[in-house]
Amino acid sequence: MSGFFQRLFGKDNKPAIARGPLGLHLNSGFTLDTLAFRLLEDELLIALPGEEFTVAAVSHIDLGGGSQIFRYYTSGDEFLQINTTGGEDIDDIDDIKLFVYEESYGISKESHWREAINAKAMGAITLNWQEKRWQRFFNSEEPGNIEPVYMLEKVENQNHAKWEVHNFSMGYQRQVTEDTYEYLLLNGEESFNDLGEPEWLFSRALGVDIPLTSLHIIG
């Protein structure tokens, strides 16, 4: 009988979709106007794989002080990152970037993991990579080599599996044109399997700024 009344009044027990900034959520999609990047493809290292993407996993990072990072991982090798301060409305958005993973590899020994994420390995003021010179923009005012920035990321995928990733990150940038920058994100990831054993991964991803006007949400 209760099912009858639920149908009659249009009510159901489906949980509300958890939406983030711009209404993005699991299984939603988004398109990008990539013309500006196509015109610079000879200057950029990043290769944008397409213009339409499906969100296969979402994550949230609380930076404290009202600052948050929302990440929308696609079914490919990309993720859309939205930084906000004070809330999740459009006026709270500070920054939107699209990152594409260039490489990633697993690390099996703890000693190698420690070496990969120490200040000397990933915290220099400048970095030479892919025959380009990159400038650190994480804590750019600090001199010398610095420790990576720790961020706890809470992830959920399309199967509603949830887990935490301990990120040790460093961001670099290089100026491509007067108003265009390309970003290099170095990231050491530590997570734990069902047995409580650590699993380590190191990755490099290239990114670009995404103007709000070039982003369209689907679903």
Identify the function of each model-found stretch.
Residues 1-51, 58-219:
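Mixed-charge, low-complexity intrinsically disordered regions
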